[in-house]
From Swiss-Prot:
The lineage of its organism: Eukaryota, Fungi, Dikarya, Ascomycota, Pezizomycotina. Its EC number is 3.1.-.-. HAMAP family: Endonuc_su_Slx1 (MF_03100). Forms a heterodimer with slx4. Its cofactor is a divalent metal cation. GO terms for biological process: double-strand break repair via homologous recombination. InterPro entries: GIY-YIG_endonuc, GIY-YIG_endonuc_sf, Slx1, SLX1_C, SLX1_endonuclease, Znf_RING, Znf_RING/FYVE/PHD. Residues 17-99 form the GIY-YIG domain. The keyword Nucleotide-binding does not apply. It comes from Talaromyces stipitatus (strain ATCC 10500 / CBS 375.48 / QM 6759 / NRRL 1006). This is Structure-specific endonuclease subunit slx1. It is found in: Nucleus.
Length: 389
């Protein structure tokens, strides 16, 4: 099966190294919750707690700090997808996706508003997690290869209790991961959460070896490669080639061949597979990791070159950042990031774009800018949206 570069429909820029929607909880007042999104949970948590610039105004109050992340939803293939999910999670009373979920009861008029009128702070962990469960079961988001990572045993217990009374189960595309860490405030500094989220790799370091292997393999064997699925010879100049992500496996495929194989193995009628077994090494491979390396190889440009050379680009706070109380955070080591990866939006970005996807729209659609006749892609890193209608 042949797929020419001119017919490419993979991406026009590298898939983000990491992007998640998160649920914050106040360590001082556990009933206070906040929903947001970010490509860097550790940095974003510093912002919310006043140790770095850019935190949301709704989380500035010292009576609520420190904030801790108790759950994140990860695996989004683009920033736009994460923003669509964040908006729907924040606006469950208006999003069209909840209505498609069986018969679970949801108060869409929200008789129980946030703690303070207009504060944007939620007050019920079970309700917020219940809303999340319904979104993940919706026709639209239920087809995405997302993972819900719980960092709090208490939050996971609320989740489990919701599941016991919910009408339906999560689709097979959705995974749940337990990653319990110390909760509440740090015993060393009450202004810091016990879990600072630095254990999560939000960089491209995870694909460096895969990218190096693919670049070498495709560069050295331009006339001797054949697709592991259809057995036809591959052209590195005219075809989109996918390489197995496992270290010792050198299997290569037409992107359409391996996609179709994975879909058949899944018994799926969808367009995009979730994961599958490499026909050569017989190990499990996720579609997202294949596409992340492919998109970096095809569209990374100088950033892909940096990654291959192992060059590290330090973040702005490498030398340490002062806290709102005059303290200083330890310096961080460099990360594998891309130029332009951390362009923050204004706090009212949601007022300028429409991120609610229609039932016909896929993640390929960019957000529609108000007052514009064309479509532009949202290029952002952190959600600065504070309010919930």
């Amino acid at each position: 099966m042949t797929t020419t570069v001119s017919e490419e429909a993979v991406l026009t820029k590298p898939i983000p190294a990491f992007y998640c929607c998160y649920l914050l909880r106040s360590a001082k007042r556990p009933s206070a919750l906040y929903i947001g999104s970010t490509p860097d949970p550790a940095r974003r948590l510093e912002q919310h707690n006043g140790f770095a610039k850019g935190g949301a105004k709704r989380t500035e109050r010292n009576t609520l700090r420190p904030w801790e992340m108790v759950a994140i939803v990860e695996g989004f293939p683009s920033r736009t997808g994460a923003l669509q999910f964040e908006w729907s999670w924040q606006h469950v009373h208006t999003t069209r996706h909840i209505g498609a979920v069986e018969t679970d009861q949801l108060n869409r008029k929200r008789k129980n508003p946030p703690t303070d009128k207009g504060s944007g702070i939620w007050t019920s962990t079970p309700k917020v997690l219940g809303n999340l469960h319904q979104l993940l079961r919706s026709t639209y988001f239920g087809t995405w290869p997302l993972t819900v990572r719980f960092l709090s045993s208490e939050a996971h217990n609320h989740w489990q209790r919701w599941i016991e009374r919910a009408d339906g189960l999560l689709p097979d595309t959705i995974r749940v991961k337990l990653d319990f860490r110390a909760e509440g405030a740090s015993v060393l500094d009450s202004n810091l959460p016990a879990n600072d989220m630095t254990h999560i790799d939000a960089t491209y370091g995870g694909i460096q070896e895969h990218l190096a292997k693919s670049t070498s393999l495709l560069g050295d064997n331009t006339n001797s490669l054949s697709c592991e699925v259809c057995q036809q010879q591959l052209s590195t100049q005219t075809e989109i080639i996918v390489v197995c992500s496992h270290r010792r496996c050198h299997a290569v495929f037409h992107v359409n061949c391996i996609s179709q194989l994975f879909l058949e193995d899944e018994g799926s009628s969808g367009l995009v597979p979730i994961l599958g077994e490499c026909p050569a090494c017989r190990q499990e491979v996720t579609w997202v990791e294949l596409m992340k390396e492919l998109s970096m190889r095809l569209h990374g440009g100088k950033n892909a070159t940096k990654l291959l050379k192992g060059e590290r680009k330090d973040k702005a706070n490498t030398q340490g950042t002062k806290s709102s109380k005059g303290g200083k955070k330890p310096a961080k080591t460099g990360d594998y990031t891309l130029d332009g990866d951390y362009e923050d939006l204004d706090e009212d970005w949601m007022n300028a774009v429409n991120v609610e996807p229609s039932s016909e729209d896929g993640d390929r659609n960019a957000a529609n800018v108000k007052g514009s006749t064309g479509r532009v892609e949202i290029v952002i890193d952190d959600s600065e949206e504070d309010g919930f209608d």
